C-alpha cells in the first residue's frame, strides 16, 4: 500500500538560526574573572600555552549567544552569501595569557610523555604551517581595547569551520569588534570570517593562525576522531574533514588512502573484503558522524553557568570552588570507569570478524564487530598496496598496562591526560593480594623523590604522574588482544524519558495504534500509572523514597500494621491493573516475554557534561555506534559486489556514493539511532551584512545581501536507544548462561534470613525487642531452623507468635514467587518488589529470574590523605618520614559508588550515564530483508572497574558464580539539582485539600468494606482536624466528588460527633463512632436467576432479544474498522 512520505518541517533550529560569522575571538578583562573556578573546568597542563574552557553562557560567552548559526562561508556573487548551518564547538580555546589559569594537574612532563607515546604507537605529530606569511599580530587583537597585562583571549568556532581555524584560513575583522556583557564584565568579541569571503585582490590577508591553538585542536580534538576511525595520519583526517565541510564532499570517499591495515587482517583468507568493510565503516563515520556532530541542537540549561544549582548555597568564592570540586569528583566515576574497563570505547582498536561456530546458528549480520584490545594498538600495519605503514611497537612485558597506554587513552593530548589524571586523583586504590610490597608512603619517600624520574626529576614526587600510576596500577586493565565479540563502554547523558522501572516498558499501550481503536471504550491503565498510584498511596501512609521504617515502626504491632497496609495497597492495585489488561485484550503472558528496560542516550552535544574529556568520550561513542550499525550493510553490499582483485580505494570510487545513499535510510529509526531530517530555509529575502573588503581597512559599510544555503536538508540525530531484556529467553543459550537465570526448585532453609523482611527485622531489632540480648540474625535463623522463639522480657507471647507467623508465611510466599534478585532495603523497594513479583507470577514467569538493572551512583567521602599524596601539590619530599609528617593532618576527597538508589528515580534526573553497549543486527519477519538493529545493554570487563561489579563469592544465598549475569549496572550522575534546576512548575503543586479528597475517594473504591462511611469520617478528621466543626455541605461535595450522593451518611455522623461535644481528634471520633455502631446483621443474598415475588413480570416486548448479531457486535465492529475500505 503506497503511502506519502511526510515532508520535513521548515520550522526548526536551523531555519531560525541567525546569519553570523564562522567564529569569534573574545578579549576578556582580567579583573573580576573567576580564574580559580574556570581552572577547575579547564584542562591546562603544566607549561601549556593554550587550553580550553567549556562554552558556557556568562563564563566564556554572553548570555544571549547564538549556539546555532548560519555561518557565512563565501560570496557566490556580489549580492549573494553562501551560508552553512552549524552548531558551535563546545570549547573556548584560550591562547593568550594562559598563565592566569592554574594547571588542573600539577604533575610536569605530560607533553613529553604524550609525544613519546604518539611516536611509539605510530601516530603523526603536529607540524605548524610555515607557508603562511600574512598572519595577524596578537597585539593587534587586544591593543584597541586592553593592555597586555589586563586581559586574556580565547577563540570560539563553529563545528563546521574548526578545520579552517586549524589551518589558519579564518580572518578577524578587528574594526567590527563588539562589546558584550559576560556576567557583568565587559568583554569584546571580534568576528572571524573565512578567507574565501574576501576578494581575490587582497594579497595580504591578516589570517588568524596561532600554532598553539592548532596544536590543541590537533592533539585534543582531531587525534581523538582519527583514533575512532583507526587512522594514524591525523593531518589527513583534518584535510578530509575540511573538504567534507567546506566543499560538501559527503558522498565521496576521502580517507581510504590514509587507512592502514594490520598484517593479520591482510593475510587472512578474505583480506580484500576485510579491508573494504573497514574502509566503508570509517568513511561512513566520517560522512555521517561528523555531519551529525555539526547539526544544530537545542541549547539547554547546562550551558547557563550562573544558574547551576551547585552554587545556590555558596556564599564565598571558597564555597563555589568546593562546589565545583565536589561535582568534578562525582563526574570522575565515569572517566576512571573507561580507563579501568577492558572494553572501553577508548580501547576500540580494530574491526574484527567472528569465527564460525558449530554449536548454534550464528547470526551472519553480527559477523563483523568493533573489537577492543590494547594489544592490537601495537601491531604492525601496511597500506592497501602492501607498503609498510607502521612497524609496530615493542611488546610490553607480560601484557602490563603502562603510562603510554594511558596517554593512548587520552588521545596523546597532554590536556586530556591532565584532565584524566585530575579525575583519577579522586579514585580510591584497590591493592592486589599479589602486590605484597605496595606502600604509597615508601614509594613517595624513596623512588619518586629520586632524580631517576624522567618527567619531574624528583622535584614533584607527590603529584608526579608516576606516583599516581603507582597508586592505581592494580586497577588498570591487562594489555590483551581479545577475539571475542564483547560490548563496549560508552558515556553520554540520558534522555528525558526512560523506562527503567523493574518491568521497563511493560503495558505502555504504545505498541499498536489499532489496539487503541478497537478498545477505545476501555480505560488504559499503564504500568507507569500503576507505579505512580502505588507510590502516591504509600506516601499518604508515610512511606516515601528512602523510608527505612524507623519513622513508622515502634513496636511489633506497628511493624505488622505497616507491612500489612503496604501489602493491601499493592495487592489491590495489581488486581485493578491485571483486570485492565484483560479488558483491553492484552495477551500479557506473551507481552511480558518482550519487555525491556529502555535507556535513551541523548545525541545533543549541548547536554553533555561541560568538560573536554566528556566531549571526547561523546565523539568517540557516537562514531563507534555509527560504525557498528553500518558493518552488516557494508558486508552485504560487498558480498553483492565482490572486491576481489581491487584495492579498497579503487572499489570505493565506484561504489561509495551508492553505499552512502543506502545508509541514509538504514541508520535512522531502525532500532538504535533515532532522528529527523530538517528542511533548512531562510525566510528573509535579505540579511544585514557589511562590505567585508572595506572592513579590513577599518571602514564599516552596512549593506544588504541575499542568502543561499549550502545544504537545504540536514539529518539531526536525537537519541540512541539502549535496551535490556528483562525476561530470560531460553532459546539458543549455553548452559552457563542458563545457570545464571534458572531458579532452583529446591526449597531453601534460610528463606527468612534471605527474605524481604530481614533488613527491617535487623535494623529495627532494638526497637521491637529493646531488652533482647541476642542478634536479629541468630533469632530468625534459629526460628527458621527449629521453629522456636525466645522468651523475651517485656514482649507478649501473642505478639511474638503473630510476628513470627507473618514473617514465616510471607517469606515462604516470597521465596516461592520471587524472580527478582533484589533484597529490599527500604519500604518503597519492598512494595515495588512485591508488586512486580505478583505481576510476573500472574504472567506465568516463575522458572527463570528476571534481569535487574541497578545504578551505580557516586558518593563523596573525605578520608585521611596518608595514601593520597597529590594533596601536597608540588611540595618537595626528602624522605619517608618527611612525607608522613607533611601529610599528617591533611585529608583527601575521594569517591565511591553506591547501589542503594532506585535507578528509575535517578533516570528522571538527566544523569550522565556510562553503559556497556552491543549493537545486534537482524532482519524483519515474513521475508523482510531490511536490516534492523537493537542496542543491548552489556557488561563491564575488568576487575578494577568498581568494587560493586566484583561478583559475590559467598553469602547467605550460596548462589553460583554466574548469578551476576542476571544483574546489569549503569553508572549514573544526576545533572538535575547539580547543573540543571528542578522543574518548579506551579501547576504541579498539590494542595492539602487535594490530598484529603484523593484519600477519601480511595476509601470509597473499597466498596466491600462495611465501615466505609466511618473510615471516610476518620480520614476527614485526620486531614482537617478542628476545621471539621465548621464543615458545610459544599465542603462535603468537594471532598466526596462523584460519591456526593452518599453525603447524607457522612453528614449524619458529623451531627453525632457534634452533639457528643468530643474534640475533633482521630481517637475521640473513633470512640464516638464505636459507641453508636449498630450490631452487625447477617444478610442473605439471593441470585438474580431466582424469581422473587416482588419483581414485576417482564413485558415481552421490552425484553432484549439475544440474536447472533448482538453476540458478535464487537467482533463485527472490529472487522469493519479493519476492512472499511475494501469493496466486498
Swiss-Prot record:
One of its GO terms (cellular component) is host cell nucleus. Its main location: host cell. It is found in: Host nucleus. A zinc finger (unnamed) spans 453-466. InterPro entries: DBP_sf, Viral_ssDBP_head, Viral_ssDNA-bd. GO terms for molecular function: single-stranded DNA binding; zinc ion binding. Residues 1098-1128 are annotated as: Required for nuclear localization. The keyword Metal-binding applies. Keywords: DNA replication, DNA-binding, Host nucleus, Metal-binding, Zinc, Zinc-finger. Pfam families: Viral_DNA_bp (PF00747). GO terms for biological process: DNA replication. Single-stranded DNA-binding protein required for DNA replication. Belongs to the herpesviridae major DNA-binding protein family. Homooligomers. Forms double-helical filaments necessary for the formation of replication compartments within the host nucleus. Interacts with the origin-binding protein. Interacts with the helicase primase complex; this interaction stimulates primer synthesis activity of the helicase-primase complex. Interacts with the DNA polymerase. Interacts with the alkaline exonuclease; this interaction increases its nuclease processivity. This is Major DNA-binding protein. The lineage of its organism: Viruses, Duplodnaviria, Heunggongvirae, Peploviricota, Herviviricetes. The gene is DBP.
Amino acid at each position: 500500500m503506497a503511502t506519502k512520505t511526510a515532508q520535513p518541517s521548515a520550522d526548526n533550529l536551523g531555519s531560525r538560526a541567525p546569519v553570523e560569522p564562522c567564529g569569534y575571538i573574545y578579549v576578556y578583562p582580567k579583573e573580576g574573572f573567576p580564574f580559580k573556578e574556570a581552572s577547575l573546568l579547564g584542562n591546562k597542563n603544566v607549561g601549556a600555552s593554550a587550553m580550553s574552557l567549556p562554552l558556557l553562557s556568562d563564563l566564556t560567552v554572553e548570555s544571549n549567544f547564538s549556539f546555532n548559526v548560519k555561518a557565512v562561508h563565501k560570496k557566490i556573487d556580489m549580492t549573494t552569501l553562501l551560508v552553512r548551518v552549524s552548531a558551535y564547538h563546545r570549547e573556548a580555546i584560550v591562547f593568550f595569557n594562559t598563565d592566569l589559569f592554574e594547571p588542573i594537574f600539577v604533575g610536569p612532563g605530560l607533553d613529553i610523555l604524550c609525544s613519546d607515546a604518539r611516536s611509539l604507537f605510530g601516530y603523526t605529530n603536529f607540524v605548524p604551517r610555515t607557508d603562511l606569511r600574512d598572519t595577524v599580530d596578537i597585539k593587534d587583537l587586544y591593543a584597541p581595547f586592553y593592555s597586555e597585562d589586563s586581559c586574556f583571549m580565547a577563540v570560539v568556532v563553529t563545528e563546521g569551520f574548526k578545520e579552517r581555524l586549524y589551518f589558519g584560513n579564518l580572518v578577524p575583522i578587528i574594526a567590527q569588534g563588539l562589546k558584550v556583557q559576560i556576567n557583568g564584565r565587559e568583554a569584546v568579541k571580534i568576528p572571524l570570517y573565512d578567507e574565501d569571503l574576501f576578494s581575490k585582490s587582497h594579497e595580504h590577508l591578516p589570517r588568524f593562525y596561532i600554532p598553539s591553538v592548532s596544536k590543541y585542536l590537533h592533539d585534543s580534538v582531531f587525534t581523538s576522531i582519527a583514533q575512532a576511525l583507526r587512522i594514524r595520519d591525523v593531518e589527513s583526517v583534518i584535510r578530509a574533514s575540511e573538504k567534507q565541510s567546506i566543499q560538501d564532499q559527503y558522498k565521496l570517499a576521502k580517507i581510504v588512502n590514509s587507512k592502514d591495515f594490520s598484517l593479520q587482517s591482510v593475510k587472512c583468507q578474505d583480506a580484500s573484503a576485510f579491508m573494504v568493510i573497514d574502509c566503508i565503516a570509517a568513511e561512513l563515520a566520517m560522512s555521517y558522524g561528523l555531519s551529525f556532530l555539526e547539526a544544530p541542537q537545542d541549547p539547554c540549561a547546562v550551558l547557563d553557568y550562573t544558574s547551576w544549582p551547585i552554587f545556590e548555597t555558596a556564599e564565598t568564592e571558597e564555597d563555589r570552588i568546593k562546589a565545583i570540586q565536589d561535582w568534578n569528583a562525582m563526574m570522575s566515576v565515569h572517566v576512571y570507569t573507561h580507563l579501568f574497563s577492558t572494553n572501553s570505547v577508548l580501547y576500540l582498536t580494530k574491526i574484527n570478524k567472528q569465527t564460525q561456530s558449530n554449536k548454534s546458528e550464528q547470526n551472519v549480520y553480527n559477523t563483523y564487530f568493533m573489537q577492543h584490545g590494547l594489544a592490537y594498538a601495537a601491531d604492525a600495519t601496511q597500506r592497501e598496496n602492501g607498503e609498510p605503514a607502521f612497524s609496530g611497537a615493542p611488546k610490553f612485558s607480560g601484557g602490563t598496562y603502562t603510562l603510554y597506554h594511558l596517554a593512548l587513552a587520552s588521545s596523546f593530548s597532554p590536556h586530556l591526560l591532565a584532565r584524566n589524571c585530575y579525575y583519577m586523583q579522586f579514585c580510591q586504590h584497590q591493592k592486589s593480594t599479589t602486590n605484597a610490597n605496595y606502600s604509597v608512603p615508601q614509594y613517595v619517600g624513596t623512588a619518586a623523590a629520586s632524580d631517576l624520574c624522567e618527567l619531574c626529576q624528583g622535584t614533584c614526587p607527590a603529584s608526579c604522574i608516576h606516583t599516581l600510576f603507582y597508586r592505581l596500577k592494580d586497577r588498570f586493565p591487562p594489555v590483551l588482544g581479545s577475539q571475542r565479540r564483547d560490548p563496549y563502554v560508552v558515556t553520554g547523558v540520558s534522555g528525558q524519558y526512560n523506562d527503567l522501572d523493574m518491568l521497563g516498558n511493560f503495558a505502555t499501550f504504545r505498541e499498536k495504534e489499532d489496539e487503541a481503536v478497537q478498545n477505545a471504550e476501555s480505560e488504559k491503565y499503564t504500568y507507569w500509572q500503576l507505579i505512580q498510584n502505588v507510590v502516591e498511596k504509600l506516601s499518604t501512609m508515610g512511606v516515601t523514597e528512602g523510608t527505612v521504617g524507623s519513622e513508622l515502626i515502634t513496636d511489633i504491632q506497628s511493624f505488622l500494621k505497616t507491612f500489612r497496609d503496604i501489602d493491601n495497597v499493592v495487592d489491590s492495585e495489581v488486581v485493578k491493573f491485571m483486570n485492565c489488561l484483560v479488558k483491553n485484550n492484552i495477551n500479557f503472558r506473551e507481552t511480558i516475554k518482550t519487555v525491556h528496560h529502555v535507556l535513551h542516550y541523548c545525541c545533543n552535544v549541548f547536554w553533555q557534561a561541560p568538560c573536554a574529556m566528556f566531549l571526547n568520550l561523546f565523539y568517540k561513542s557516537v562514531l563507534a555506534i555509527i560504525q557498528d550499525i553500518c558493518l552488516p550493510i557494508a558486508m552485504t553490499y560487498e558480498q553483492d559486489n565482490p572486491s576481489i582483485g581491487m584495492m579498497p580505494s579503487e572499489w570505493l570510487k565506484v561504489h561509495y556514493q551508492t553505499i552512502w545513499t543506502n545508509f541514509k535510510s538504514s541508520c535512522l529509526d531502525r532500532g538504535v539511532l533515532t532522528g529527523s531530517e530538517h528542511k533548512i530555509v531562510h525566510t528573509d529575502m535579505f540579511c544585514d551584512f557589511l562590505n567585508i573588503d572595506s572592513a579590513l581597512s577599518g571602514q564599516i559599510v552596512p549593506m544588504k545581501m541575499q542568502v543561499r544555503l549550502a545544504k537545504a536538508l540536514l539529518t539531526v540525530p536525537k537519541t540512541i536507544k539502549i535496551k535490556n531484556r528483562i525476561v530470560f529467553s531460553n532459546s539458543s543459550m549455553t548452559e552457563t548462561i542458563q545457570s545464571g537465570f534458572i531458579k532452583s526448585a529446591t526449597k531453601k532453609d534460610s528463606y527468612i534470613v534471605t527474605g524481604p523482611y530481614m533488613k527491617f527485622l535487623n535494623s529495627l531489632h532494638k526497637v521491637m525487642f529493646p531488652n533482647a540480648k541476642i542478634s536479629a540474625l541468630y533469632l530468625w535463623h534459629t526460628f527458621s531452623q527449629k521453629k522456636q522463639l525466645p522468651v523475651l522480657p517485656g514482649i507478649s507471647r501473642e505478639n511474638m507468635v503473630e510476628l513470627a507467623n507473618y514473617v514465616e508465611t510471607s517469606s515462604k510466599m516470597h521465596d516461592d514467587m520471587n524472580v527478582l534478585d533484589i533484597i529490599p532495603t527500604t519500604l518503597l523497594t519492598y512494595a515495588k518488589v512485591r508488586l512486580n513479583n505478583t505481576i510476573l507470577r500472574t504472567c506465568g514467569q516463575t522458572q527463570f529470574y528476571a534481569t535487574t538493572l541497578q545504578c551505580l551512583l557516586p558518593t563523596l567521602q573525605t578520608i585521611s590523605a596518608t595514601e593520597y599524596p597529590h594533596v601536597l601539590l608540588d611540595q618537595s619530599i626528602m624522605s619517608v618520614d618527611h612525607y608522613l609528617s607533611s601529610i599528617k593532618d591533611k585529608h583527601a576527597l575521594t569517591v565511591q559508588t553506591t547501589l542503594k538508589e532506585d535507578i528509575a528515580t535517578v533516570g528522571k534526573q538527566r544523569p550522565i550515564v556510562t553503559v556497556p553497549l552491543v549493537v545486534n543486527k537482524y532482519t524483519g519477519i515474513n521475508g523482510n530483508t531490511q536490516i534492523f538493529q537493537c542496542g543491548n545493554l552489556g557488561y563491564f570487563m575488568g576487575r578494577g572497574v568498581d568494587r560493586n561489579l566484583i561478583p559475590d563469592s559467598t553469602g547467605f544465598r550460596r548462589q553460583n558464580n554466574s548469578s551476576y549475569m542476571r544483574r546489569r549496572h549503569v553508572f549514573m550522575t544526576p545533572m538535575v539539582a547539580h547543573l540543571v534546576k528542578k522543574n518548579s512548575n506551579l501547576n504541579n503543586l498539590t494542595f492539602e485539600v487535594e490530598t484529603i479528597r484523593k484519600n477519601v475517594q480511595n476509601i470509597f473504591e473499597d466498596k466491600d468494606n462495611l465501615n466505609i462511611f466511618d473510615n471516610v469520617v476518620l480520614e476527614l478528621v485526620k486531614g482537617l482536624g478542628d476545621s471539621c466543626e465548621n464543615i458545610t455541605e459544599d465542603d462535603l461535595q468537594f471532598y466526596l466528588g462523584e460519591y456526593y450522593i452518599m453525603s447524607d451518611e457522612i453528614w449524619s455522623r458529623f451531627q453525632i460527633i457534634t452533639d457528643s461535644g468530643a474534640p475533633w481528634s482521630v481517637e475521640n471520633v473513633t470512640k464516638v463512632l464505636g459507641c453508636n455502631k449498630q450490631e452487625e446483621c447477617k444478610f442473605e443474598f439471593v441470585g438474580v436467576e431466582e424469581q422473587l415475588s416482588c419483581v414485576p413480570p417482564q413485558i415481552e416486548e421490552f425484553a432484549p432479544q439475544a440474536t447472533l448479531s448482538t453476540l458478535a457486535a464487537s467482533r463485527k465492529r472490529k472487522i469493519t474498522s479493519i476492512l472499511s475500505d475494501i469493496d466486498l
